[in-house]
Amino acid sequence: MSFLDFIQNATSSSSCDMAIDLGTANTLVAITGQGIVINEPSVVAIERSTHRVLAVGHEAKNMINHTPDTFSAEHPLHDGVIADYDVTEAMISAFINKAAPRRYPWQPKPRIVVCIPCGATSVEKRAVFEATIQAGARQAYLIEEPMAAAMGADLPVTEPTGSMVVDIGGGTTEVAVISLGGIVTSSSLRLAGNRLDEAIAVHLRDLLGIKIGERTAEVIKIKIGSILPFEDGRERDMIISGQDVLTEQPKEVTIQSEDVRDALQAPIDEMVVHIKETFKKTNPDLASDIISNGILLTGGGGLLAGLDRYLSQQLEIPVWTSETALTNVVSGCLKVLETPTALKQILMRSK
């Protein structure tokens, strides 16, 4: 192989564009032609003595678990937006390099599509854009999460029909009505999976006198959490460990799924009110489409047992949970990159 051939091969092989679902709890990265290559926690390990970024994602979580006194865990995104710019930039850069390392300095940087909450301010949008460019993007595009989720779930977003999406992530619940390649009306509620975890922890502290951490609360939600009785008619229970509220000594208790349901009632009902308010802003023709086609429930929070049935009862509209709820957003971002017409029609509109 000649040196020219070597340069051409190296350049072409590295010219890959990326989609990033920059979430409060997890970050997913997908590459054109490859699909999803990274799905890791949105956490960064910072050395306490020097304040240096040492690791991100799974590696950061493992370091902190093994040597908690030496490192601190930073979650650079809160409620779906950047809380610490420098740490976010470092995290994005690390994930970009891990997904597609640049082996030669002349290799082109990737174009990157990043999702943002539909309620993000212009300052918050600018922060995501700048962080992505500084982290190594040749060009950066922003797309609102509900639009990306709808595309990832193969909803007819460019057609003259109304589609409604409820995307429950770690930090925000995004609600949007989509038609003709644009978001007709939308809203963003900074209440989502993390707040459900907090509600569980607070309720168990008050009910059983036990203090638990956020990881334990999340496990409880996933294993025995529900907002309606389980369809098989059987309730669940689970043994958990924590600290006694009064003595701070180790404590182990058995909790019931009914206890978790009580904890989740108030925040879920707040979501219902939010969805109803967004639907009220929809024009009659699109509202008719939504009533006929149903509402897409997506995001990790959308997987809570019984949530689709509960929303359907409260809204009096069919609600269905996507089979790919965890990956719809990043898949939709990737679809935009792989479809030139979508890149022009949807991304340019969202500038």
Give residue ranges: language-model regions.
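Nucleotide/phosphate-binding catalytic cleft detector across ATP-hydrolyzing
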Residues: 1-168, 176-295, 302-351
